[in-house]
């Protein structure tokens, strides 16, 4: 084999050609003389056996076409020296014969290439078994219920626990009765009387124990049924929270009810004051002039203004003066003809609620105020006070002209009109 052929074939190999071959690339390949049939076949067979594996790239070996053996020996299509191979620029090592123009074109092609992005692969929930999913959901619900019930433990007792005072629970829980130790039973929202509430009455606790109820029977039924129907299948903490919220929403501002008169109060202190003043029969503050007793010192101070002659509250419509601002407010209802309180029996309307209640005793015949001396009963407390002066002989109303005293104010007015000619 001539030396010139080996040199030309070596130069024509892709290892020694630039990345951007010139226009005479195919021309040089065509000028290579083809060997004879017998000689060429032997040479090609020998070269195919002797060709080292290092001269072929890994990509070219993997992407080798199946019909390469059937291709013509002079064809470069699909071979390593094919200039249009898509793997040419990735595996070919740099050559010192690369021109600057070709380097610029190569850099431009790399700059224009799209950035490499990682493919997003969503997590397949189907990979988990059904039991695993149920376990995760149940664990989350239990954690949520515990977090929500943790804040309620500051306000709502859920059962008799060691180390807690018995006064925080109802009487059944404190005495170990039927309601003791029941989980989910709120000592605040329950219908039973709390020991702490009864402790507010002091000496009047035994007498006022039957007058205390929280909440009312109807309202308690509402919130209990509501809580059990909506939250029966939930945890204890959520149930306690729902019952407490339902109690606040349904009962509103007033949730402490007096059983005797059905009056509702928003705080236990208000109920305690009401029981002490109205139903306990004990009024420790007495007026020195008329002997009238009161449950609070503030009420006594307001009452003392009745005995004074000063009238500092004047009506701007008729000019009438009053000793109390509350009396003036009641008087102004007369000028406006506002009677918002009707009688449920006869329909007669009144300015004040107290006047309406006094009027209803006429229809019912009820006389709740009884004299302790003679046993006579009255429908109004004012009539009982006036009657008690007959037994004591006390005459708080005296004439400033003659000094004569009277038990009732109306008797003094009549005396001034008839005896002294004053109106």
From Swiss-Prot:
SUPFAM superfamilies: beta-beta-alpha zinc fingers (SSF57667). Residues 1-20 are annotated as: SNAG domain. One of its GO terms (cellular component) is nucleoplasm. It is found in: Nucleus. Residues 1-76 are annotated as: Disordered. Changing residue 2 to A: Abrogates transcriptional repression. No change in nuclear location. Changing residue 4 to A: Partial loss of transcription repression. No change in nuclear location. Keywords: DNA-binding, Metal-binding, Nucleus, Phosphoprotein, Repeat, Transcription, Transcription regulation, Ubl conjugation, Zinc, Zinc-finger. Residues 48-57 have a biased composition (Basic and acidic residues). It comes from the Eukaryota. SMART domains: ZnF_C2H2. Pfam families: zf-C2H2. Transmembrane segments: none annotated. Ubiquitinated. The keyword Protein biosynthesis does not apply. The modification Phosphoserine is found at residues 20, 57. The keyword Isomerase does not apply. GO terms for molecular function: DNA binding; DNA-binding transcription repressor activity; enzyme-substrate adaptor activity; zinc ion binding. Induction: By IL2 and CSF3. Induced by the endotoxin bacterial lipopolysaccharide (LPS) in primary bone marrow macrophages (BMDMs). Disruption phenotype: Null mice exhibit neutropenia, characterized by absence of neutrophils. This results in growth retardation, susceptibility to bacterial infection and early lethality. Immature granulocytes and macrophage precursors accumulate in bone marrow. Mice have inner ear anomalies, as they are ataxic, circle, display head tilting behavior and do not respond to noise. In the inner ear, hair cells are disorganized in both vestibule and cochlea. Outer hair cells of the cochlea are initially improperly innervated, and just before birth, mice lose all cochlear hair cells due to apoptosis. Zinc fingers 3,4 and 5 are required for DNA binding and for interaction with SPI1. The SNAG domain of GFIs is required for nuclear location and for interaction with some corepressors. Transcription repressor essential for hematopoiesis. Functions in a cell-context and development-specific manner. Binds to 5'-TAAATCAC[AT]GCA-3' in the promoter region of a large number of genes. Component of several complexes, including the EHMT2-GFI1-HDAC1, AJUBA-GFI1-HDAC1 and RCOR-GFI-KDM1A-HDAC complexes, that suppress, via histone deacetylase (HDAC) recruitment, a number of genes implicated in multilineage blood cell development. Regulates neutrophil differentiation, promotes proliferation of lymphoid cells, and is required for granulocyte development. Interacts (via the zinc-finger domain) with ARIH2; the interaction prevents GFI1 ubiquitination and proteasomal degradation. Forms a complex with EHMT2 and HDAC1 to promote 'Lys-9' dimethylation of H3 (H3K9Me2) and repress expression of target genes. Interacts directly with EHMT2. Interacts with RUNX1T1; the interaction represses HDAC-mediated transcriptional activity. Interacts (via the C-terminal zinc fingers) with ZBTB17; the interaction results in the recruitment of GFI1 to the CDKN1A/p21 and CDKNIB promoters and repression of transcription. Interacts with U2AF1L4. This is Zinc finger protein Gfi-1. The gene is Gfi1.
